[in-house]
Swiss-Prot record:
Enzymatic reactions: ATP + protein L-histidine = ADP + protein N-phospho-L-histidine
Protein name as it appears in the record: Detocs histidine-protein kinase DtcA
EC number: 2.7.13.3
Superkingdom of source: Bacteria
Class in the EC hierarchy, top level: transferase
Length: 984
């Protein structure tokens, strides 16, 4: 490595920092605290953490600070993962030793170790210098040198990420660079600080959503080392002294070098709340060596085009010691940060924004077309050279100044600007967009703005407005032809046309009832739109999707308003889980695979840690396991609520048992030999059904080894599908929309994997039908007429088992989500029919007239579940031929909910009172697994639906004069619930 005489000298000096003069054990006033440290093995991270936690909990804050500083400055504890003021390896962030230091406390240490910091700064400047020149191998040598001198820091992590990005974006072909990157990650034990590593990687990854990643970081509530550092990557300029000290303290907890760089950066930036000239002159001059080097976008990217400003913005926190980078990030980040923290205004950044856009006063001054010359500027907005990012923030700046009140000409310009802006729907305040929509003088603008509103504000009201606008515009101008509407918008703005195309998926189109007559028509319209757009844009993925939809139209018959393929995984909740828990880990693993020294894709699904694809495989297996095993939105939730809670057994056996009392066959059971044989057959049949329910129709696990649904890639057919998933992910990942498409691609392939188990499940049901579902009896004596009666009975039994097993097999078809909309009264009728399959005597007197109430979206499964619980209980405990009334209405004080009321008749007032008592008892005990409460799990489920937000205002009461039991609840139109253990 590159080490000069001064470097070696400072290395030796830093190895013995404790001798320079810092906190000594005797400086800690508390005898108790000193004794805790004396009894600690300084090489043990756990013991040292435990001792410091005891001091934190039993001594004063001052004692704890001094004890922690003693550990961080003493050479005795140099090997522990807690870290030191100067470190050669990253500290372990998994500790609860977070403590806040003041600016004055940290400055004291910076001035005390000024000489050491100056030499580290000189080495850091060499790293920056060689990066700027494109000498990445030499820069990595100096990175190693910095670590050897105990200069491991967040600064070093940022530079490693920057070099990694250059390798990918510039498409370098140098295995030595990859080897050095891998070596440095191991050298500094980067995995100890996995949260910071992930934050740096994901924020600067140009394929991931910047807003989603930033929001996840800003929404972190718990305190831990590194949290404030990560937040400073998103919000680089602190609003006040308290915020500044909070971030500074977190940097100080990582390394003294990082704390020095943070103070120096803002001494150079001249924040009003910070005293000037806090640092020694020589220290500040050493910092200037780092900050004076300016990275040029021309060197950073292969081409400088309309997206270069956005790319530069995404990466600027990696090198924001450079004043221009800090300024550029602060100006444009102001609007991105404001998108999810609108209640917090940073006045310092606001002043920078006003200065940057001071030369812009009207929409006519913005950019409307591509150009040949692009320059990323941090001083002033320039429409002649700006890219899409700068043009977008300029537009939002003007919209805020005008409060969304645009004149006729500006309304036309707003639509045209959609072809040269980005992220407007996510970043522009929704109030501004709502104002523009309310004053829009033409359908075109209203359509564009309502599309933008639904991007970041998907409520029942906003989607209704968008549907209404699309239908009004389409009917008035294009005779109801959506394809002509898309083509017209494409001539105005390809970006708007593409956005509308993505909005108008099959589910959305099925709700355009004025121009799409039937749900199946939505598939055809969607296919036509995708085909046209694929042709005009030369995008094969749109053409492929169009072909698949047209095939679906041919092979799938219209199933009515309710999909009878009952198995279901909620794609919304799964995507939410994926974005919260998996997207960061998976993108980092894919990046590591793509830049690894031996990037060979060799999937091994049984030994995840083998080969370079091991991390990716492990994470994809976790995605598949969640898809199957999650008890709220996965396959397991369906198996729990639909198979194991009564439907399966009732459907399989109820009508067979009814044959005992059937007038046509009742006399046959007077034959004891026949009755005994049928009893034995039915007993074996029911044992088989019970075995299926308890052991086969389960997620396979150690407890359920015979489960039909495996979360492993355990068959050759599954391996083929899983291998295709990896190659598909790698294929789309390099594209701009790759990361956004990951959830839908993974869901699609998860269904392909599950479909193999579904096929095996249906095969198993068929085998069980053949082995246990066939009854035959021929009496030894009697006339031909007499024997024909037994033969007819056997045919009746076998016909019933064939019918029921065919029905149950259909429950394990891969679902078609093309039309998730239905009339709630039809939904009610479907539940009645299903419950009748389990209770043959259940014939309620229903009077619902010609009422109808249409609801769209996959959420009607919640209504289905709630009604099933209530009607199933009514059939079991109520009057089998009693009155039943069902009403749907909109509450007067609510716009985002519907009210559902169910009235069921019981045999007597005593039965009503008993039912009320049983319900109250059931609702008192809503803890535990639903399987443990066979008779009460229904009421428990209703309570859980209420607790997780899918329904509300759940209440029950009686009408004594009519012997009626009444259930009343609200269904929340805006809620998809939380992904907790809802259906356990």
């Amino acid at each position: 490595m590159l080490q000069g005489v001064s470097d070696l000298s400072i290395k030796q000096l830093l190895l013995g920092v404790n001798n320079v003069g810092s906190v000594h054990l005797s400086d800690i006033p508390s005898t108790r605290a000193r004794n805790f440290l004396r009894g600690t093995d300084p090489t043990s991270f756990k013991q040292t953490c435990r001792a410091l936690e005891k001091i934190k909990n039993s001594c004063t804050e001052s004692d704890f600070k001094k004890a922690l500083l003693f550990v961080r400055s003493s050479s005795l504890f140099d090997g522990t993962e807690i870290g030191q003021l100067f470190i050669d390896r990253c500290p372990n962030e998994s500790n609860e030793l977070d403590v806040k230091y003041s600016l004055s406390e940290i400055l004291r240490y910076i001035n005390q170790f000024a000489d050491e910091l100056i030499v580290l700064s000189d080495c850091a400047a060499k790293i920056i210098k060689h990066i700027d020149k494109g000498n990445y191998g030499t820069a990595l040598d100096y990175c190693s040198n910095l670590a050897d001198m105990k200069g491991t820091s967040v600064f070093l992590i940022r530079q490693l990420s920057y070099i990694t990005n250059r390798y990918q974006l510039l498409e370098l072909d140098d295995s030595e660079i990859l080897r050095k990157i891998d070596y440095m990650k191991q050298r500094i034990s980067l995995s100890r600080s996995s949260f910071l590593e992930g934050a740096v990687t994901q924020l600067s990854n140009l394929r991931t959503s910047y807003i989603a990643t930033s929001k996840r970081i800003q929404d972190i509530k718990e305190d831990f080392q590194g949290k404030e550092i990560a937040k400073s990557f998103v919000q680089p300029i602190p609003s006040n002294l308290h915020e500044f000290e909070s971030v500074l303290s977190d940097y100080f907890s990582f390394s003294l070098f990082d704390a020095f760089l943070y103070i120096a950066k803002f001494q150079s930036f001249s924040l009003q709340y910070l005293p000037s000239n806090q640092l020694d002159v020589d220290l500040f001059l050493s910092y200037k060596k780092i900050s004076s080097i300016k990275f040029s976008p021309e060197k950073m990217y292969k081409t400088v085009d309309e997206d270069a400003g956005y790319y530069y913005f995404r990466e600027s926190f990696l090198f924001n010691e450079q004043k221009g980078a800090l300024r550029f990030q602060s100006i444009h980040g102001y609007y991105y940060y404001d998108a999810f923290r609108s209640n917090l205004k940073n006045l310092i950044q606001k002043q920078l924004v006003n200065d940057y856009f001071s030369n812009v006063n009207s929409l006519e001054q913005l950019k409307y077309t591509n150009s040949d010359n692009y320059v990323v500027k941090s001083e002033k907005y320039d429409s002649t050279t700006c890219g899409m990012l700068e043009n977008s923030t300029a537009l939002i700046h003007l919209l805020e100044r005008k409060q969304g009140k645009l004149d006729t000409r500006e309304q036309e310009l707003f639509v045209e600007l959609m072809s040269y802006t980005r992220d407007v729907g996510e970043v522009c305040p929704k109030e501004i967009l709502a104002t523009i929509s309310s004053i829009a003088q033409c359908f075109r603008l209203k359509l564009v703005v309502n599309c933008l509103i639904t991007i970041n504000n998907k409520t029942q009201v906003s989607e209704h407005q968008l549907r209404s606008t699309i239908q009004d515009y389409c009917i008035e101008k294009f005779g109801g032809d959506l394809n002509l509407l898309i083509q017209h918008l494409y001539d105005i703005s390809p970006a708007v046309a593409e956005h509308l195309l993505l909005t108008c998926d099959e589910k959305f189109l099925a709700t355009l009832f004025r121009i799409v007559d039937r749900p199946v028509d939505a598939i055809k319209v969607r296919a036509d739109m995708l085909y046209w757009y694929g042709k005009i844009s030369s995008e094969e993925r749109y053409l492929d999707r169009a072909k698949m939809l047209k095939i679906d139209i041919q092979i799938n018959k219209e199933k009515g308003t309710i999909d009878d393929s009952r198995i279901y995984v909620d794609p919304f909740k799964y995507t939410q889980w994926f974005e919260d828990q998996m997207v960061g880990k998976l993108t980092m693993a894919i990046d590591n695979l793509l830049i690894s020294e031996h990037a060979v894709v060799n999937p091994n699904w049984k030994h995840m840690g083998v080969g370079t694809t091991g991390d990716v495989i492990e994470l994809l297996l976790a995605c598949y396991k969640e898809f199957c095993d999650n008890k709220s939105f996965g396959i397991a939730s369906y198996l729990g609520r639909r198979i194991r809670h009564g439907t399966f057994e009732g459907t399989a056996s109820t009508e067979l048992k009814a044959l005992y009392t059937n007038e046509e066959y009742k006399h046959l059971f007077e034959d004891k030999e026949f009755a005994t044989k049928f009893d034995e057959w039915l007993n074996q049949y029911e044992l088989m059904i019970s075995e299926l329910k308890k052991n086969a129709l389960q997620i396979k696990s150690k407890r359920k080894p015979s489960g039909c649904f495996s979360t492993d890639i355990d068959t050759p057919q599954k391996k083929i599908v899983a291998d295709q998933l990896i190659f598909e992910i790698l294929r789309i990942y390099s594209k701009r929309s790759g990361v956004i498409r990951l959830p839908s691609v993974i869901i699609d392939y998860c269904w392909r994997l599950v479909e193999l188990d579904l096929t095996a499940t249906k095969k198993l049901l068929s085998e069980k039908k053949s082995s246990h579902g066939v009854f035959s009896y021929t009496p030894k004596f009697g006339s031909s007429s007499y024997k024909r009666q037994y033969s007819k009975f056997s045919q009746e039994v076998n016909s019933l088992t064939s019918q029921k097993f065919g029905l149950m097999a259909s429950w394990f078809n891969k679902p078609n989500y093309a039309s998730p909309s239905t009339d709630i009264y039809l939904l009610f009728n479907a539940v009645i029919s299903e419950v009748k399959d389990s209770f043959r005597d259940f014939e309620p007197k229903i009077d619902q007239g010609q009422r109808s109430f249409t609801i769209n979206g996959g959420t009607y499964y919640v209504i289905y579940d709630a009604l099933f619980v209530l009607i199933h209980n009514a059939a079991r405990h109520g009057k089998s031929d009693g009155k039943m009334n069902f009403f749907v209405s909109i509450p007067e004080d609510r716009t985002n909910a519907i009210r559902l009321q169910l009235f069921t008749e019981l045999d007597s007032i005593d039965s009503v009172d008993k039912a009320l008592s049983n319900i109250e008892e059931a609702l008192l005990n809503t803890q535990g697994d639903a399987d443990e409460f066979d008779n009460k799990s229904g009421m428990k489920k209703l309570k859980k639906l209420e607790n997780e937000g899918s329904i509300s205002e759940l209440q029950f009461y009686s009408k004594p004069e009519e012997n009626m039991l009444c259930f009343d609840f609200h269904f929340e139109l805006d809620s998809r619930g939380k992904y907790d253990d809802l259906d356990s």
